[in-house]
C-alpha cells in the first residue's frame, strides 16, 4: 500500500551503515504508528526489515545481533510512536476525554502533540542507543547498500489509488493540525476523509467487512 511505498522510499535514501539504518527503520515505524494502530505499523515495517536482513551476507554473531536489535527496535517503536498523536492509540483519545470531563481541560488534535511528540522524540533515540550498546551494532562493519537497493529499488511506483490515498491523507492531517483555525471537529474531518475514499472508489463497501472492528 501507500504506507509501505513511503517507508521503502525513505529506506532507499537512508545511510547504508547498520546503526543508522536501524535508527531509520525505528523512526519510520514510530511515525507510522502515530497515524495507525501500533500493530499495523510494525506489520508494515517488519517485513521490509526482515527482507533487508535476509540479503545481508551472514557474518555469524554480528549478523544475528544486528537482526535481533533491528526486530526489537521496530517492535519497541511501534508502541512508542502511538504516544505521538491523538489517534496513535485509543488510550490517547480516552485520556483526552477524561481530561475534558474531570479537569475541564479541552484538547484539540494539535494540542496532543505538545504532550506526546516530545516523549517520542526522546524515547526513540534512547531505545536506539540502548540496542546499540546491548547488541554491539556499532561494531558491525557491513555494507547494506546492495541489500537496500534490492528491496526498495523496483517498488516505488505509485498507482492511481495510492496517489489518491496519499493526497487525502495529507489533507486530513492538515485539517487536523489547523482545527483551531477553521473550527471543524477532528471527528468530522476523519469521517469526510473516509467518505472521500469511497467517492473516489479507493475502497469499496465490501472492504468494510475485512476491517478488524
Residue ranges and their predicted role:
Residues 37-41, 59, 101, 131-141, ...:
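Transmembrane helix-loop junctions in multipass membrane proteins, especially transporters and channels
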Amino acid at each position: 500500500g501507500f504506507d509501505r511505498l513511503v517507508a521503502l522510499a525513505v529506506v532507499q535514501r537512508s545511510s547504508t551503515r547498520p546503526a543508522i539504518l536501524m535508527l531509520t527503520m525505528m523512526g519510520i515505524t514510530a511515525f507510522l504508528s502515530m497515524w495507525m494502530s501500533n500493530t499495523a505499523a510494525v506489520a508494515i515495517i517488519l517485513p521490509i526489515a526482515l527482507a533487508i536482513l535476509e540479503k545481508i551476507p551472514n557474518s555469524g554473531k554480528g549478523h544475528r545481533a544486528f537482526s535481533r536489535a533491528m526486530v526489537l527496535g521496530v517492535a519497541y517503536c511501534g508502541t512508542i510512536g502511538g504516544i505521538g498523536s491523538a489517534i496513535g492509540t485509543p488510550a490517547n483519545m480516552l485520556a483526552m476525554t477524561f481530561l475534558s470531563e474531570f479537569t475541564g481541560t479541552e484538547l484539540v488534535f494539535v494540542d496532543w502533540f505538545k504532550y506526546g511528540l516530545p516523549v517520542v522524540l526522546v524515547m526513540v533515540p534512547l531505545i536506539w542507543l540502548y540496542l546499540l550498546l546491548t547488541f554491539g551494532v556499532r561494531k558491525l562493519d557491513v555494507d547494506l547498500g546492495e541489500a537496500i537497493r534490492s528491496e526498495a529499488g523496483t517498488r516505488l511506483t505509485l498507482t492511481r489509488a495510492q496517489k489518491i490515498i496519499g493526497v487525502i491523507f495529507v489533507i486530513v492531517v492538515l485539517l487536523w493540525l489547523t482545527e483551531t483555525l477553521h473550527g471543524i471537529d477532528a471527528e468530522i474531518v476523519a469521517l469526510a476523509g473516509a467518505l472521500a475514499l469511497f467517492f473516489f472508489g479507493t475502497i469499496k463497501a465490501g472492504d468494510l467487512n475485512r476491517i478488524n472492528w
